[in-house]
Amino acid sequence: MATPAVQTPQTPQAAPNGVLSSISKPHDRPVIITLCGDSGMGKTSLAALFPKPIFIRAEDGMQAIPAERRPDAFPLLNSTETLWEQMMALIKEEHDYKTLVIDSVTALERMFIAQIIEEDPKNPRSINQAMGGYGAGLQAVAGLHQRVRKAAGVLNERMKMHIVFIAHADTETIELPDQDPYTRYGLRLGKKSVAPYVDDSDVVGFIKLQTFTRGEGDRKQAISTGARLLVTYATANNVSKNRYGITSDLPMEEGVNPLIEYIPSLQGVK
């Protein structure tokens, strides 16, 4: 009786237009960054050092920048409709801007809250009572922030623009199941509104004063020369992160963007 021939399995061949043919190494894209810090720390000044910026202003932070160095900016926002108009103009109309700066998402939050309260026919006293309460108002605010982030993502991907979100800082209590509660600096936003600017950013930078202590015991005093540092690595003191391997504080010098050295998409671009 003849022994049946053993068939060798055929090696699968990739289809010329199959899904696997689309695989490639992703290219560097423009950065998406959130800058956080107390008032007067230089957030707007640093944002103005990104390549050819255009500012969307929910507040006017330009006065800290000398007039001859001020970047281009849209008129101050007076409604959320104006915000969408300005963002859509950058998406649809021809221009040569390379960075969108939104100053600030904290001020946008106030605008969003005011709109939701004003549009509620029941005339709620606060955002907590808006839209029937039970967190619905705050969820609606978070949805508007998500819309901002989505439009910014289109500019980043389609128009190859860097995106800089500016946020004011506030303290928040962190409660973890395996640690005692502790306080850190975070974004001055509702808890549900934070994710678009932290989870979905390449860099979250916290600007702080460089401080030293003098004296001993109860007589210790914090002193500072006024020098500022940009923190972009994970730390318990403040919300911060980066996807570029930065592991130390970055000194901030006037007129110099300390991130250029670390972010490929910023190098060689004016």
State each model region's role.
Residues 172-270:
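Conserved GTP-binding G-domain of TRAFAC-class P-loop NTPases and closely related GTPase folds
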Residues 15-18, 23-102, 106-114:
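Conserved P-loop
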Residues 53-55, 163, 204-206:
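Short, well-ordered beta-strand core segments
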